[in-house]
A protein has these predicted regions:
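N-terminal, Lys/Arg- and Ser/Thr-rich interaction peptides
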Residues: 2-42
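Immediate flanking context of iron-sulfur cluster ligation sites
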Residues: 22-32, 60-82
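Local cysteine-cluster metal-coordination motifs and their immediate loop/turn environment
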Residues: 30-45, 75-93
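Small-residue-enriched alpha-helical segments and adjacent helix-cap loops
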Residues: 34-72
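Short Fe-S-cluster ligation motifs
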Residues: 64-79, 106-138
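Short flanking/linker segments adjacent to small metal-binding domains or redox-active Cys/His motifs
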Residues: 84-85, 91-96, 119-156
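Short Cys/His-based metal-binding microdomains
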Residues: 94-104
Length: 156
């Protein structure tokens, strides 16, 4: 600090600190849809197709009208291990928590895509309750931590 006359000046330069969003924000997100989810244990298929396959078709129809967020993708999978609570979808992205929703119906297709947008924009996969579409609230059944960027402790 310098003193000039009666004024005291701080000569230390103040660098502006920019807060950068973590690299996980806006990372490509993938929506996984379980094709093998059944309608019920009593009625596993309708017209030789499972409920998961119908949900996948409904989601694809919505995507034709409104594309996925940039670099995001859709992947049909054989099983998401939520067989007691069909239909199931999951969301994954680098550096973000993985999320699985269960008890979904064909009517949830648009809400699944709305949530994908919120998940894509989230910092670490924690989407505020207010941003979760009404039809998905209370249906989050699995939350897994993001995988480590690199292994710190390796098994020997």
């Amino acid at each position: 600090m310098r003193q000039s006359g009666s004024k005291v000046r701080n000569t230390t330069s103040r660098a502006k600190v920019r807060r950068r969003k973590p690299a996980s924000v806006r990372q490509p997100a993938t929506l996984y849809v379980c094709r093998s989810c059944v309608w019920s244990e009593a009625q596993r298929e309708r017209d030789d197709r499972r409920q998961g396959d119908f949900l996948l078709e409904a989601i694809n129809q919505k995507i034709e009208r409104a594309p996925l967020p940039q670099n995001s993708g859709l992947r049909a999978v054989h099983c998401l291990n939520g067989c007691k609570t069909p239909c199931n979808v999951a969301f994954r992205a680098p550096g973000k928590h993985g999320l699985r929703f269960s008890h979904l119906t064909l009517e949830n297709a648009g809400e699944v895509l709305s949530f994908l947008g919120a998940y894509f924009e989230s910092e670490v996969g924690n989407v505020p309750e207010a941003d979760i579409p009404e039809g998905l609230r209370g249906k989050l059944t699995v939350r897994t931590p993001p995988p480590p960027i690199r292994s710190i402790n390796r098994l020997k």
